[in-house]
């Protein structure tokens, strides 16, 4: 090596590791099945893979008044409303009774919550079952009230696809059930646990270097 030659430290040549993805499970309760329908509850949890199981790091829930949905131009689907009337009393009251907010505030609060979860350069993963339902309806509601969303179409992940892949890899554990079905937050919690358990299972199948 000449006097002008020098070697860079190995660490300087290696890219800095990316921060882990911010994983969020989203669940909506609605009065329709198409974009533009009324959103009556938004539930979400931030979850992570830790040790032998998942961990819930943060939670979000807003229930929304129908009056505000109507004022925003969101519609009510009669068959969906009739379906709600057949659900257990606890599910109905958890969504349609108690303290509720308007759809403007709900969309603003949710997008701010998602934005505040992020870290610089940390990828965002928004999970749903399926995203074709929750993503499109949530984005339509946000658009109706003029709230920009802090995610792109590549940020969404499909729990149903993960379920199929894990099953093909031999996953057979029973699913975690929500403490109260059709409660947006309870559904999001259960779905987060089910996603995390499958992700951990698939990780265990990857050969160690």
Question: Predicted regions span which residues?
Answer:
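Active-site catalytic pocket residues across diverse enzymes, especially alpha/beta-hydrolases
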Residues: 142-146, 166, 198-202
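Conserved non-catalytic scaffold segment of RNase H-like nuclease domains
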Residues: 13-24, 29-128
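Acidic active-site catalytic centers that drive phospho-/nucleotidyl reactions
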Residues: 27-29, 134, 158, 187
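Charged, flexible boundary elements
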Residues: 2-15
